[in-house]
C-alpha cells in the first residue's frame, strides 16, 4: 500500500469518533468481519489506528478505497460542511430521459479527467436514488489534494445537486459542466440557498418539509392551556388576551404550518437603494452610488426561531414576508433593489 494512501486512511480514521468507528468500518465493507474481530477497540485510539492500517496494508488498499471511507465519514458528519444547491434545466422541448446510473458516473468522470490531468473521482450510491460524489482536485502539474475535496450529492432524475462549499472556486464551472452533461440537462444555476443541514435543503427544494418531518398536534384550544394570567385580572382583559393569542396562533400556523421547520442557520439580505429626499441640495440625494446595507439573521434553527417570535410576543403577527418566504422561495440569500 502506498504511503500516501496509508496516511490518508490514518487521518480519516483519526477523525472518526470511537463510538462510530465500528459502524463506519462495517459500512465501508473493505475489511472483513473476521479482520475487524481481531481489533481491540477498547484500547487507545492510536493503537487501534495502527492495527487498522496494518490490516489495510495486508489488503493493499488503494486511493479509491480510502476515498470511499472518506465519503462514508462525510455522510455521517454532513453538518461539517456548508452545502450549496444547484438547479439544472432542460432545453425547450427536451424530453425527460431514462436515467442510467452507470452511464452518469462514466460520463461525469470522463468530463473531469479530460479537463484535468490530475483528479480523483469517487462515487457511492445510497438507498434514496442518490449518488455521493467525491472529487479531489489537482492541476496539470500537481497531484489531487485528497484533504480538500468537493462533495456532491445528486438525486437521480431530479434537476437538483447539492455541493459542499469549496475554496477552489475556479473549478465550479467545470463541476457544473460535468453535472449538466452527465445528467442530460441543458444548463445549471446556483440557487441562493445554503445550509449545513443537507436533509433540510433537500426537504426545501423537493417541498417535502410538511411531509418528511414529524408533525405534532397542537389542536388544544388556548382556553385549555395555561396562559399564565393573574386570576384577579379583569375578565375583559383576559378575554382580550385570549382572542389576541388565538389570532397570533392562527396567523403563525397559516404562515409556517403545523409541523417542525427545515433547519437553516442563517438568512442574509443585501439592500441597494437610492436615497430619496424632497430637500434640494441634499448630499445623499445627489449621490450616484446606491446605499448598500447587509442584514444577517442567524440562529441554530432560524425558521423555528422566526416561527416562535410572534407567539412569544417579541414581534407582531404577521411577520414580514421577507422572513416567512424562505422555504417557499427556496432561498436564504436575498438581494433587494429599488423597483
Curated annotation (Swiss-Prot):
It is found in: Nucleus; Chromosome, Centromere, Kinetochore. Pfam families: CENP-N (PF05238). InterPro entries: CENP-NAC/CAD_complex, Chl4/mis15/CENP-N. GO terms for cellular component: cytosol; inner kinetochore; nucleoplasm; nucleus. GO terms for biological process: CENP-A containing chromatin assembly; chromosome segregation. The modification Phosphoserine is found at residues 226, 235, 282. Its main location: nucleus. Keywords: Centromere, Chromosome, Kinetochore, Nucleus, Phosphoprotein. Component of the CENPA-NAC complex, at least composed of CENPA, CENPC, CENPH, CENPM, CENPN, CENPT and CENPU. The CENPA-NAC complex interacts with the CENPA-CAD complex, composed of CENPI, CENPK, CENPL, CENPO, CENPP, CENPQ, CENPR and CENPS. Interacts directly with CENPA. Identified in a centromere complex containing histones H2A, H2B and H4, and at least CENPA, CENPB, CENPC, CENPT, CENPN, HJURP, SUPT16H, SSRP1 and RSF1. Belongs to the CENP-N/CHL4 family. PANTHER family: CENTROMERE PROTEIN N (PTHR46790:SF1). Component of the CENPA-NAC (nucleosome-associated) complex, a complex that plays a central role in assembly of kinetochore proteins, mitotic progression and chromosome segregation. The CENPA-NAC complex recruits the CENPA-CAD (nucleosome distal) complex and may be involved in incorporation of newly synthesized CENPA into centromeres. CENPN is the first protein to bind specifically to CENPA nucleosomes and the direct binding of CENPA nucleosomes by CENPN is required for centromere assembly. Required for chromosome congression and efficiently align the chromosomes on a metaphase plate. This is Centromere protein N. It comes from Homo sapiens (Human).
